[in-house]
Each structure stands twice: as structure tokens, then as C-alpha cells.
């Protein structure tokens, strides 16, 4: 592991690495199984799901970034990066809503759909949202900026009932922009963490990050760790969950190449039961 300790030291993270390459191969291997909706009920549930996803992006991912800008003390580089994050994620959210409208024009998918959420148990993840509102460090490591999604999003983006337009939107817009703008934030995250280490000490800072990460990972932060959403997508869209097998390896890679130290072990309560969760291994300094 390269020594990347200290503010301003370039991180060792590489966008193309064996883990993301493995996930991309999994994505591609599922393409042949994808198909368009066969009838109006399938168009309706696909449209309502995509509408739900778009509204969730706008209300929560974008909303929390706006909250962070207005409530947390941060420098202007952070404000610039978060503004770009807001623009990108808002485009994705609105894009999913418009894709939903094209699939099922009988419904305005920009409007709340509480009946859909109630029917399938897609409740707001209030605990996870609350963590992100505490402070900037919690927002970074509990939320969308820390890119666990490079591995976990293969599930939510792996729906088997879809359309060519949705696939093109996800490939050309969502996946490309997600990787690009998240990766641009990683050097800033590294420097912010090492600023905290210089101010408060390494042990307390690492302990605080470990606490935030563990609490967030057990608050249904992502679809694959949220049983209601995961079960809904497995039942109606046959999404993959094999990608979770690479999660702990990806977590180790992120910590070592972005922060310069290993993660503390964590047990995720809502881990998919079909995939064995690796045994906990103590972090080495």
C-alpha cells in the first residue's frame, strides 16, 4: 500500500481496478436476460419504480447535499464540488422520472406515489437520513459521496425488465457521470480527513470514521442492504445480488487508496442471506 498520509498527498485510487472490472463484467453478463415490459401491468410497475427512484434521488441525495451546503462549515472548494454533485444527481433523478413518463404516459411520475411505497414497504430510511444531517464527516461517510455504489449499484441498475432508452440513459449518463464526479471528490475527502487528523489526532479521527461507517451500513443505506427495496427488486425485476460478494474487498480498497489506512471490521445486519458475509478481520495499522 502506497504511503498517502498527509494533507495534499495524492491518493493512490485508480478508477479502473480489478474490483470494478469484475463488477462491470457482471453487469455485461446480465444484458442478454433483459427485456422490455410485456403488458400494461409491467409497464406500470416499471414506471412507478423508476419514478420512485427519481424522486428519491431528488428528495434525498440532492436534498441532503443542499442541506450540507447550508448547514455545515466548509471551504469554497467543498461548495464547488457539492454544487456539481447536486447538478449531476438532480439530472439523474429528473431523468429517471422522464423515463418513467415515457414508459407509462398514463401517470405523472413527478408526483408523490404513497400508495406504491405503502404497497411494497418502500419506507423512508429515516435513521440513515438522520446520520447524514449531523455533521460534514457523517455526511461524507454515511452518504452518497463515499462511493460504495461503484459495487452496490449493480443491483439497483440490474433490473431485468427495462427499455432500450432506460439502458442507454443509465449507460451513457448515469454510470459515466457517477464514476466521474464521485472520483473527483476523493482527493478532497482524503485531504479533509487528514486535516482532521492534524487537528484532533489520528486515533480519534479514525475511530469516529469507523463509528459513522458502521452505523450507516446498518441503517439500510443502499438498496442491497435494505430488505424491503431489495426484496421488491428481486421479486419483480430479478436484480442481481452477487456483486455484494465484492463489497468488503471494495471497502478495503477505498480506505487504503483514498484515506491511507484500513477500515475497521464491520458486520452488516441486513446483508443478503443468499451470499455468505466474510468473517470479520481486525484492521492492521
Positions of the model-derived regions?
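Non-heme di-metal
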Residues: 2-285
Amino acid at each position: 500500500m502506497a504511503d498517502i498520509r498527509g494533507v495534499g498527498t495524492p491518493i493512490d485510487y485508480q478508477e479502473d481496478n480489478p474490483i470494478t472490472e469484475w463488477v462491470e463484467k457482471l453487469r455485461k453478463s446480465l444484458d442478454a436476460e433483459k427485456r422490455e415490459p410485456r403488458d400494461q401491468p409491467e409497464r406500470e410497475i416499471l414506471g412507478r419504480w423508476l419514478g420512485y427512484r427519481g424522486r428519491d434521488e431528488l428528495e434525498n441525495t440532492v436534498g441532503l447535499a443542499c442541506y450540507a451546503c447550508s448547514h455545515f462549515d466548509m471551504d469554497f472548494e467543498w461548495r464547488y464540488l457539492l454544487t456539481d454533485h447536486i447538478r449531476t444527481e438532480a439530472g439523474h433523478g429528473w431523468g429517471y422520472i422522464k423515463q418513467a413518463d415515457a414508459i407509462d404516459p398514463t401517470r405523472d411520475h413527478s408526483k408523490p406515489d404513497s400508495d406504491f411505497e405503502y404497497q411494497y414497504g418502500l419506507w423512508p430510511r429515516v435513521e440513515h437520513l438522520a446520520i447524514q444531517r449531523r455533521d460534514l464527516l457523517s455526511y461524507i461517510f454515511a452518504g452518497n459521496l463515499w462511493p460504495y455504489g461503484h459495487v452496490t449499484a449493480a443491483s439497483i441498475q440490474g433490473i431485468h425488465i427495462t427499455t432500450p432508452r432506460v439502458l442507454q440513459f443509465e449507460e451513457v449518463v448515469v454510470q459515466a457521470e457517477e464514476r466521474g464526479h464521485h472520483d473527483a471528490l476523493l482527493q478532497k475527502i482524503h485531504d479533509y480527513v487528514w486535516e482532521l487528523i492534524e487537528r484532533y489526532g489520528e486515533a480519534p479521527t479514525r475511530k469516529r470514521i469507523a463509528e459513522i461507517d458502521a452505523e450507516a451500513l446498518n441503517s439500510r443505506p443502499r438498496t442491497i442492504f435494505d430488505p424491503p427495496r431489495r426484496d421488491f427488486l428481486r421479486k419483480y425485476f430479478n436484480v442481481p445480488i452477487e456483486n455484494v460478494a465484492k463489497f468488503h474487498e471494495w471497502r478495503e480498497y477505498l480506505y487504503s487508496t483514498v484515506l491511507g489506512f484500513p477500515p475497521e471490521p464491520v458486520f452488516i445486519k441486513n446483508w443478503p442471506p443468499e451470499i455468505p458475509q466474510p468473517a470479520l478481520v481486525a484492521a492492521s495499522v
